[in-house]
């Protein structure tokens, strides 16, 4: 294995996602939170950059913008951001949350990266975390990581999916179970040599060419 590090975001943070909008990249990431030792208090922040290449002279982040937050007694952790720029209408959506509460969806302004004024979060799933949204042929797919992580060979992470005709849900698996009620079809599980696959990501290499990523 070869480690290829990227640019460091100001203020640290974890679990980033990025989407290209026009000639800029919008990055969403988490500050604190995560349940258990991390507590439930957290924030999801967004910032812009002209490039993701830390060696470029144009590499410079804008000031972070808070788009979601949670407090210690809340039923959702503001962590694990996932971005979707809807190809059907250009609207921008952010999912976030962990296994310790609801997965929530909010709408952002694609011009500013700020939360749309007056937008109220929507609960779309439970019993998963590190969600990502994909649009395909009239369907919105919600992928989430189910199970426990960070326990070596005892980790039970796996990736589940549901789909909906609307980005706001309801997301349903192949058996008709709603992800808001704990449903989700397993699509990636542990193998003989790998334990705990999670944090699904999709990367567009070129027109018609995409690759997926996940961690063990």
Regions found by a protein language model. Give the residues of each.
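Short loop/turn segments immediately following beta-strands, especially the blade-tip
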Residues: 49-57, 107-114, 162-172
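Asp-box/WD-like beta-propeller blade repeats and closely related beta-sheet repeat scaffolds
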Residues: 34, 38-85
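Beta-propeller and closely related beta-sheet repeat lectin domains
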Residues: 12-17, 79-82, 129-132, 198-201
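Conserved small/polar residues in nucleotide/adenosyl-binding loops
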Residues: 215-216
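Blade-loop segments of beta-propeller domains
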Residues: 1-21
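Loop/turn-rich, solvent-exposed surfaces of beta-rich toroidal or solenoidal domains
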Residues: 132-176
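Conserved blade-ending motifs and adjacent loop-strand segments that build the rim/top face
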Residues: 177-199
